[in-house]
Amino acid sequence: VYKRQCICCVSNLDYTASAAVISIYHKICDTIIDSNFIISAFFRLVRFILKPGYKKAKLKYPNLCSGIEFYMSEQSRIENEQCTSIDHACEPTAQIMSLIAQGISDNPEDKKYLSGLGYHLGRFTYIADASDDLEKDIKNGNYNPLFLNFQDIEEAKKFAEENINMSMGMIAEFY
């Protein structure tokens, strides 16, 4: 079997691809835990297919992998505790994105800005997802810190919009 060679190997491309594989793998593991038998069976198959790529990425970037693993377990703990603080709930996602973003550069000055950009992008992503899923989470009884705080959907959406705008402003600041 002939293995194709990379036309243009770039270390940042390798890093971002590895970061994506590591993130997706851990998200799949989380989905398996949170899902019913049929859905988890499908994701177990996906995890099995992804495992060789995950092992390769983990060997290249062990600190990134252990950081993502740690923050994913923190996210699970926060959800299991039914944490009502939006700031605490979005912190693990923000830290994961910060960790990934700062790994793009070796320059300490760049790392500082990339870390902040990644952090606020993660915060933005978590709050936007919580806002988008609000009605579905209420219907299915899933964890959603917006609903735990507000009970009124419109009030929760308004709060989310304000926080999303703040995060977008911070992203622009770090950009």
Where are the regions a protein language model picked out?
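Acidic catalytic motifs of isoprenoid enzymes
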Residues: 3-116, 123, 127-165, 173-175
